């Protein structure tokens, strides 16, 4: 949504990879050939718009079909006004506000083989507002990683 990104976008990327790793659990997808990307969109307005889309008079696509945001919102729900507060591009904000309200899915339904902690971490990394996501230190200090964390004397 924004042209300038901070480290928060890396947390989003790790969250997407985390979700895709959850798909590799047999309990979540029994047929390995049916495993797929978490958000396999073809474009994402405004940074990578669909060049074939019909647009309104200010250049905003009239359809959101196949926009990556549609796929994201199908999972995490549409953002609230406060969750959109970081968006500075007026066209992007208008585009977001045109999405019909929908709730987040139950992550347990999508990933029945994931532990409660794994799903909690996934949800935290996939928060729409980048400033609401945990940072790397918060994630690494999460109790979920207690059994695998190595401490260094350096």
Q: PLM features: residue spans?
A:
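Short acidic/histidine-centered micro-motifs embedded in hydrophobic/aromatic stretches
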Residues: 41, 75, 90, 141-143
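Activation segment of protein kinase catalytic domains
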Residues: 25-42
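Regulatory extensions flanking the kinase catalytic core
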Residues: 97, 124, 131-154
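C-terminal lobe substrate-recognition/regulatory segment of protein kinase catalytic domains
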Residues: 48-60, 66-124
């Amino acid at each position: 949504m924004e042209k300038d990104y901070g480290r928060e976008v890396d947390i989003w990327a790790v969250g997407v990879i985390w979700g895709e790793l959850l798909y590799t659990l047999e309990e979540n997808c029994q047929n390995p050939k049916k495993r797929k990307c978490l958000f396999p969109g073809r474009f994402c307005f405004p940074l990578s718009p669909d060049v074939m889309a019909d647009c309104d008079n200010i250049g905003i696509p009239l359809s959101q079909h196949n926009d990556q945001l549609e796929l994201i919102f199908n999972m995490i729900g549409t953002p609230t006004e406060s969750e959109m507060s970081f968006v500075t591009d007026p066209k992007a904000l208008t585009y977001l506000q045109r999405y019909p309200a929908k709730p987040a899915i139950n992550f347990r339904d999508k990933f029945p083989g994931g532990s409660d902690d794994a799903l909690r971490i996934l949800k935290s990394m996939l928060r729409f507002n980048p400033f609401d996501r945990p940072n790397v230190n918060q994630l690494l200090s999460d109790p979920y990683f207690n059994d695998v964390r190595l401490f260094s004397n350096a």
